[in-house]
């Protein structure tokens, strides 16, 4: 099942309160970028982020899920995307790690 435009728009609206987030549509799903750095995506109406040291600490209670069939890289399923302070901290720290 592809991600709906409504879910995509809602996630982007929430995330843009925490940082400059953009998306790129790919095969019905969306890759997510913060300040030009790929950090996650929206897959089948699920907001997933890459595994980094920060995401492992801050999202330790969140399940790991595969973004699509055949993927070998599990990602964290994030449910607190409406919490602006939490998302700002998560994105800022993750982007620094990914850019290293």
Features from the language model and the residues they span:
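Charge-dense, helix-prone N-terminal extensions
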Residues: 1-100
């Amino acid at each position: 099942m592809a991600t709906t435009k409504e879910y995509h728009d809602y996630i982007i609206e929430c995330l843009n309160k925490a940082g400059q987030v953009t998306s790129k549509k790919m095969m019905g799903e969306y890759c997510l970028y913060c300040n030009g750095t790929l950090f996650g995506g929206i897959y089948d109406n699920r907001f997933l982020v890459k595994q980094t040291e920060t995401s492992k600490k801050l999202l330790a209670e969140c399940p790991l899920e595969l973004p699509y069939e055949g993927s070998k890289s599990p990602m964290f399923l994030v449910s607190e995307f409406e919490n602006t302070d939490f998302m700002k901290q998560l994105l800022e720290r993750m982007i620094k790690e990914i850019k290293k």
